[in-house]
């Protein structure tokens, strides 16, 4: 009868041990995968920050409407990364850390299992010793009575530890179910909050891009192609708008040293012509 009870308790202990091992395995895997998920999200935030910087740099080189639209888009996208940072921090605190805590919890349950197994092994050892004593010395009541007393103590201790283990594992199972529900609920809530904010931000960012006036920026670009010719064209317009006298004065005053020499040559030629005319008149009179 006692041997059968021992076998039943051993089977029960094995089942409890398997339950703890199962949680240790799968919670450990979940912890690693969720931690990798959080790291990937953090890296996505870092890449998005680089994208924001590049968009701002590009915007500074563009036409007014496109420049403003790109900057507004970058501002919205940067705001989204603030929400993503909050997402990372919440996932770390509400999902990864509780799963990580199960490493310590499982270790404590294994210690309880170890204590129970030790007590049951002691009980089984005392039972075997009693059976051997009865076989070897069936008439030695003192030795048999002493062995029975030791077995009784071992049985009481094993029963106590077994009951404690059952209660502990029962609470462990109850807490495990509650925790995994809370962890996954927190995960879903955090993701929904982020994606809800992301939808708002992306809607605003999309509108900023759609508000860019393509025609106006194209006109600005086309006008910029002729900016280098603007001074010469202005000079032509100004020249065409002057009177003949103004053009003559402008030509004489702005022609430089070579033009001054030409004016002086013409004046000298005029003086020489006048002298020749006076000489001709004098000769006729003579």
Swiss-Prot record:
- What are the protein's UniProt keywords? Cell projection, Cilium, Cilium biogenesis/degradation, Coiled coil, Cytoplasm, Cytoskeleton, Differentiation, Flagellum, Membrane, Mitochondrion, Mitochondrion inner membrane, Nucleus, Spermatogenesis, Transit peptide
Q: List the disulfide bonds.
A: none
* Subcellular locations according to the entry: Cytoplasm; Cytoplasm, Cytoskeleton, Microtubule organizing center, Centrosome, Centriole; Cytoplasm, Cytoskeleton, Cilium basal body; Cell projection, Cilium
Q: What happens when the gene is disrupted?
A: Knockout homozygous mice show uni- or bilateral abnormal bone growth or exostosis on the deltoid tuberosity of the humerus, abnormalities at the left stifle consistent with a tendon calcification, and abnormal digit morphology including polysyndactyly and osteomas on the hind paw metatarsals. Exhibit male fertility defects, caused by kinked sperm flagella with the annulus mispositioned in the principal piece of the sperm.
- Which Pfam family name is an example for this entry? FAM92
Tissue localization of expression is:
Expressed in the heart, liver, spleen, lung, kidney, brain and muscle (at protein level). Strongly expressed throughout the developing limb bud, including the progress zone and the apical ectodermal ridge.
Query: Per the entry, what span does the transit peptide take up?
Result: 1-47
- State the InterPro entries in the record: AH/BAR_dom_sf, BAR_CBAR1/2, CBAR/FAM92
Renumbered to this chain, region (Disordered) spans 258-286
Q: Which residues form a coiled coil?
A: 107-178
Region described as BAR-like: 10-220
User: What is an annotated GO biological process for this record, any one?
Assistant: spermatogenesis
What are the Acidic residues biased-composition ranges?
271-286
Q: Which GO terms describe its cellular component?
A: centriole; ciliary basal body; ciliary transition zone; cilium; cytoplasm; mitochondrial inner membrane; mitochondrion; nucleus
Tell me where on the tree of life, at the top rank, the source sits. Answer: Eukaryota
How does the record comment on the protein's domains? The BAR-like domain displays limited similarity to other BAR domains.
Q: How does it assemble?
A: Homodimer (via BAR-like domain). Heterodimer with FAM92B (via BAR-like domains). Interacts (via BAR-like domain) with CBY1; this interaction is required for targeting FAM92A to centriole and cilium basal body. Interacts (via BAR-like domain) with CBY3; both proteins form a ninefold symmetric structure at the flagellar base; are recruited to the annulus in a mutually dependent manner and regulate annulus positionning.
PANTHER family given in the database record: CBY1-INTERACTING BAR DOMAIN-CONTAINING PROTEIN 1, CBY1-INTERACTING BAR DOMAIN-CONTAINING PROTEIN HOMOLOG
Function text: Plays a critical role in regulating mitochondrial ultrastructure and function by maintaining the integrity of mitochondrial morphology, particularly the organization of cristae. Preferentially binds to negatively charged phospholipids like cardiolipin and phosphatidylinositol 4,5-bisphosphate enhancing its interaction with mitochondrial membranes. Induces membrane curvature and tubulation, which are critical for maintaining mitochondrial ultrastructure and the organization of cristae. Plays a crucial role in ciliogenesis. May play a role in limb development through its role in ciliogenesis.
Family note:
Belongs to the CIBAR family.
Descriptive protein name: CBY1-interacting BAR domain-containing protein 1
């Amino acid at each position: 009868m006692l041997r059968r009870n021992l076998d039943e308790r051993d089977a029960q202990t094995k089942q409890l041990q398997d339950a703890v091992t199962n949680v240790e395995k799968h919670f450990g895997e979940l912890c690693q995968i969720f931690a990798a998920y959080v790291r990937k999200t953090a890296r996505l935030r870092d890449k998005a920050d680089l994208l924001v910087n590049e968009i701002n740099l590009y915007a500074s080189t563009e036409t007014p409407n496109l420049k403003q639209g790109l900057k507004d888009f970058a501002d919205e996208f940067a705001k989204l990364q603030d929400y993503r940072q909050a997402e990372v921090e919440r996932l770390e605190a509400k999902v990864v850390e509780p799963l990580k805590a199960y490493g310590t919890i499982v270790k404590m349950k294994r210690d309880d299992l170890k204590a129970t197994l030790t007590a049951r092994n002691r009980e089984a050892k005392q039972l075997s010793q009693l059976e051997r004593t009865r076989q070897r010395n069936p008439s030695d009541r003192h030795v048999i009575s002493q062995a029975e007393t030791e077995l009784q103590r071992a049985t009481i201790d094993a029963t106590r530890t077994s009951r404690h283990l059952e209660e502990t594992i029962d609470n462990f199972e109850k807490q495990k179910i509650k925790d995994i529900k809370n962890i996954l609920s927190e995960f879903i809530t955090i993701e929904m909050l982020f994606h809800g904010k992301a939808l708002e931000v992306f809607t605003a960012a999309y509108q900023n891009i759609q508000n860019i006036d393509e025609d106006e920026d194209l006109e600005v670009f086309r006008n910029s192609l002729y900016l280098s010719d603007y001074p010469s064209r202005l000079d032509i317009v100004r020249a065409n708008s002057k009177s003949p006298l103004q053009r003559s004065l402008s030509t004489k005053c702005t022609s430089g040293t070579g033009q001054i020499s030409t004016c002086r040559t013409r004046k000298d030629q005029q003086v020489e012509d006048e002298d020749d005319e006076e000489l001709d008149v004098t000769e006729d009179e003579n």
